Amino acid sequence: MSRKQLALFEPVLLVQALTDAVKKLSPRAQWRNPVMFVVWAGSVLTTLLTLAMVTGQIAGSALFTGIISLWLWFTVLFANFAEALAEGRSKAQANSLKGVKKTAFARRLRAPRHDAQADNVPAAELRKGDIVLVKAGDIIPCDGEVIEGGASVDESAITGESAPVIRESGGDFASVTGGTRILSDWLVIACSVNPGETFLDRMIAMVEGAQRRKTPNEIALTILLIALTIVFLLATATLWPFSAWGGNAVSVTVLVALLVCLIPTTIGGLLSAIGVAGMSRMLGANVIATSGRAVEAAGDVDVLLLDKTGTITLGNRQASDFIPARGVDERTLADAAQLASLADETPEGRSIVILAKQRFNLRERDVQSLHATFVPFTAQSRMSGINIDNRMIRKGSVDAIRRHVESNGGHFPADVEQNVENVARLGATPLVVVEGARILGVIALKDIVKGGIKERFAQLRKMGIKTVMITGDNRLTAAAIAAEAGVDDFLAEATPEAKLALIRQYQAEGRLVAMTGDGTNDAPALAQADVAVAMNSGTQAAKEAGNMVDLDSNPTKLIEVVHIGKQMLMTRGSLTTFSIANDVAKYFAIIPAAFAATYPQLNALNVMGLHSPNSAILSAVIFNALIIIFLIPLALKGVSYKPLSASAMLRRNLWIYGLGGLVVPFIGIKVIDVLLTLLGLA
């Protein structure tokens, strides 16, 4: 469930955006956008000319020059309004987050245990490494890791999700976020950041975007727009001596109007708004991007690394069968598997305990009463188990158990090898159980591929995006699930090192890679990936390594992130195409009007049949300003996105925005010309 979305044109935001748009009329603000700075300079110049004509200092039509000046100011104002409205929506989202920061005091413990002596201190004084105690009803004062206790936590202020979540020490659910509320029980938390560096602080700074850095594509497009502006500026400057030589010099007002209509003011005025709105749409999907660069990279991604569990499959693998080795009865295997899983709190571990209970009435036993030592699972060992007196029982992946058995002087039986292959071919995950160096058998864990995921992968393939499934399963299981899900490739028996190596391999081929992760062991790969979406429920290390955080902790969100990134790039490209195509109609309006008196042959270009030279110039300038206003909703919402190949997408956008950019101005300029004529202003 996402946070409540703002309407596109909230009345309060509109009023604030209008105020900010006027404030942005200062030369310092305009200098940041070179294209609009030229329009601003033209507005100032024509305003001065109007005043000079009114006072009789120079000859000319003060009414015509004044109207041109007014609409040039409107052009600048409308561009400012687009940017201010996009920024206002982001600031409104930031203000809703600021309301979460209301923790006044915290219980700072003198020792890392819940019964230690506590001091009440202002939450702002907490530093990295401080230990705090939070109880039911308290607001968590800092980002951190739970080191003791377990509690139900309301994270709706951050994620928008009303259902509470469990946070507890150990495992992947130990990370807590400052500003969330404890609903029950208590937690002892080790603060992981200093004041001003919390996740909430970074969210607020990001969505406010006051000092938003331009992305590489934005910089490249800005350079192109500046180059076009310089070319048209030089071209316009040379027209005055040509017209003067012909005996009928074009006025400065007409030359300024011509320049403004020639340069790409439409995309120049909307470019910043598109970038801000892209990050805002990402937040609307409950994904926090650390920068516009990350959103832009998402649009260029051509390789997706997707975790199998939770992304491709439902992620609730359950033990379905015990397959004993030759010479071992099924009950013995089930008993050993249950013992190895007694302290395993994963869904798979609990399902093994339950299956043993259902099949053979084997009751759970307390690890402490057995005087046993639990061996936890690690990404390196890829197995877990239990030590009871002289018994050493392990369960884990095939390769991990094989290495374990061989290191203890045993061998891997051929019949178990065959059972492993049979389980894997069915798309289930085989776990092998061993006691000492003796293989006892195989546990089959079954998972279900998500409905509709194969069709989504087919869409990504049409867009030129390669999908790679990442799994800890063996190659046979991975191949079976990959075939069922329809992914392009897979990485089986994945370790953190293997993930990192795979990302580097794709990047060496010139590809951009996106992935998700939630654990500390994912941090190196997240740091290496071009688009790294960390889960909000994940560890602090994972969130710091990624350049995006998914507040819903939904690994499938990576596909939506790519869609939003591509939509932002498409919006920018479509409006650039529309802006440049627009210029063609303006040529047919202004060039005959400006130069037909000197070169009568140019009247042949007046294909729109505009009423007079003055009405033609006014119509083009007015249309140039109004089109920015009409395109603001498109810039903020983004163009309609469909998963197509690059060539199909290019053809579609050229038809819609290229042809549209040619046709719309002809119609718009003609309509404005008719209205001006009816009003007697032409």
Curated annotation (Swiss-Prot):
Enzymatic reactions: K(+)(out) + ATP + H2O = K(+)(in) + ADP + phosphate + H(+)
Protease is among the record's keywords: no
Protein name: Potassium-transporting ATPase ATP-binding subunit
Species, as recorded: Salmonella newport (strain SL254)
SUPFAM superfamilies: Calcium ATPase, transduction domain A, Calcium ATPase, transmembrane domain M, HAD-like, Metal cation-transporting ATPase, ATP-binding domain N
Annotated keywords: ATP-binding, Cell inner membrane, Cell membrane, Ion transport, Magnesium, Membrane, Metal-binding, Nucleotide-binding, Phosphoprotein, Potassium, Potassium transport, Translocase, Transmembrane, Transmembrane helix, Transport
Membrane topology reported for the UniProt record: Multi-pass membrane protein
The encoding gene: kdpB
Residues annotated to bind Mg(2+): 518, 522
GO molecular function: ATP binding; ATP hydrolysis activity; magnesium ion binding; P-type potassium transmembrane transporter activity
Cellular component GO terms held in the UniProt record: plasma membrane
Positions that bind ATP: 344, 348, 377-384, 395
Keyword Phosphoprotein: yes
Localization: Cell inner membrane
EC number(s) recorded for this UniProt protein: 7.2.2.6
Quaternary assembly: The system is composed of three essential subunits: KdpA, KdpB and KdpC.
Taxonomic superkingdom: Bacteria
Catalytic residue list: 307 (4-aspartylphosphate intermediate)
